[in-house]
Amino acid sequence: MADPVEQFEIHKIFSLGHIGGQEIAFTNSSLYMLLAVGAVALLMLGGSAGRRLVPTRFQSMAELSYEFVVNMVRESLGEEGMKFFPLVFSIFMFVLMANLIGVIPYTFSVTSHLIVTVALALIVFLTVLLYGLYKNGLKFFRVFVPSGVPIYILPLIAMIEVISFLSRPVSHSVRLFANMLAGHITLKVFASFVTSLGALGVAGIAGAALPLAMTTAISILEVLVALLQAYVFAILTCIYLNDALHPGH
């Protein structure tokens, strides 16, 4: 049976040179991140070019994506939070496309790598922190002091809130990474069962029916997980950004 973790290995495609003794390389991970960005650009440019009263498929998909994120941001952050729409939309579409591309057989899932999800989570975390301090000054630290907390337990609650705030990039990134990693490993294991049993002949082919059915079911589930995890990552981004706009609420 093939190693189910082998699909996550990063391979160098070509070198970009050396900086400080360290090689900078263009890898398969870099390639699929560019493909995800390119797919988003193609969808949005294709959907906005030559708009029609009766929308084309590209136009319908682009408008649906746009309206979905607009409604998410408006409901979570209000009109004041619409300034963050470009950030939330970019993150949502990148994660969505990267997830969906990763579901295609023999491709590479960039969101199954923790370094990618941590980078996205840190962008959100630093945006919340820096904009919160810029907009609210020291009042931003009210986010660590929930209103209505009795004074005698306030130090304990404040400490818990600080730890919770600092751990956001961890939970935000690990949730996406773990879900995508687990799904791809499970799919690879069942697909390997099908291949191994099919190689045994007629009896093996009959025995491969159940793993094949499970592989098909998991593949469909993986598409749903790809959509759901992009939404979860985006809605958590909105929830965290709300603290920058309204600390202490």
Swiss-Prot record:
Residue spans crossing the bilayer: 30-50, 84-104, 114-134, 143-163, 193-213, 220-240
Chief location category: membrane
Descriptive protein name: ATP synthase subunit a
Keyword vocabulary terms for this entry: ATP synthesis, Cell inner membrane, Cell membrane, CF(0), Hydrogen ion transport, Ion transport, Membrane, Transmembrane, Transmembrane helix, Transport
GO cellular component: a single term: proton-transporting ATP synthase complex
Assembly, per entry: F-type ATPases have 2 components, CF(1) - the catalytic core - and CF(0) - the membrane proton channel. CF(1) has five subunits: alpha(3), beta(3), gamma(1), delta(1), epsilon(1). CF(0) has three main subunits: a(1), b(2) and c(9-12). The alpha and beta chains form an alternating ring which encloses part of the gamma chain. CF(1) is attached to CF(0) by a central stalk formed by the gamma and epsilon chains, while a peripheral stalk is formed by the delta and b chains.
Subcellular location: Cell inner membrane
Native organism: Afipia carboxidovorans (strain ATCC 49405 / DSM 1227 / KCTC 32145 / OM5) (Oligotropha carboxidovorans)
UniProt topology in membrane: Multi-pass membrane protein
Gene: atpB
Protein purpose: Key component of the proton channel; it plays a direct role in the translocation of protons across the membrane.
PROSITE patterns: ATPASE_A
